[in-house]
Amino acid sequence: MASLSPLPPDPRCPYLARMTNPAPDSHAPSLAFLEQLAHETISTLPSAFRDPATHIRIRVEDFPEDEMVAELDLDGPFDLTGLYDGIPLTEKSVSDQVTRPDVIWLFRRPILDEWAERGNVSIQELVAHVVVHELAHHFGWSDDEIAAIDQWWE
């Protein structure tokens, strides 16, 4: 039986070579690694945002639950890389009863899929982008505030 040879690099798809010819000891980033990257992102925020953001729980799962996908009317689980689950600070009151913590969900497989599709960003950059986007929902940030710390803001 003949062995398959690796695909030659294609300059139009530089990420393809990384995907088809990974280093022998490389593995897809784990749930724990993505959570670590999310916490590192929060630690680099300006202090006015960093301190309150440390109270938000970070949860990382491979995929969103079916209920999340249905509630957001998405085509499928790969359409959601992250989700803020909580009450935005702009809607909270000091008299509110805290029933559950605010959570930022990160979804590993959709993040990895987008990372492979983009091919021009690091996994750290992509996770930071998703975390900042979800934090924007929590803080009620303006477009200018988001753009000040997230260069990908569209």
Report each predicted region and the residues it spans.
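N-terminal amphipathic/basic-hydrophobic helices that include classical n-h-c signal peptides
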Residues: 1-18
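Active-site rim/adjacent substrate-binding subdomains
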Residues: 13-126, 138, 142-145
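Catalytic glutamate of the conserved HExxH
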Residues: 130, 134-138
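Short, highly charged C-terminal tails/helix-capping segments
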Residues: 144-154
